[in-house]
């Protein structure tokens, strides 16, 4: 995101967009700001397509859904969903078992409390709180409201494979194995999903080839973040 500054007596002073307009200067709109504006106006589908990408601070984000997710504050699905596809960081789900599901995990706690550690801060003002489902190891389906999350097995495949039940609908973008692949430091990376597997100490994941898998919550794998604007 471009920021507005004015140099006064050699000191750089940050200005709001409104202050810039009062000075007769038209602020530069970043791509994420434009996407947010069009999304809220219900015009995203007229301007963007699934698989379009934007780059923010050197990190690539792909549009995986338009109108897929529901804004928690309005109940409307005028959203654009993006997924981080490169420069993927690693984390474990939890230091031990996680019987109460993703919302009780250390990873989810970090995404909520320290989002600036996960995505560029310039994106954060535009990220919206949306409704997400998650399944626990015993098959219970629960609801959470989040700005940052990792995807579910059903959102990736359209059905439960290693999860005990479905938690969400498949995004249009994830039609093939290739569509699910993301990149870490050394090429294609395995990454976590928020769906529990049929054990309190295991969660679903995607392998480096875009296929379904699962592993212990204590192991460190990629965190391919999703969010909506």
Regions of interest found by a model, annotated:
Residues 1-17:
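Short, intrinsically disordered N-terminal pre-domain segments
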Residues 2, 17-229:
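Collagenous Gly-X-Y triple-helix signature in extracellular proteins
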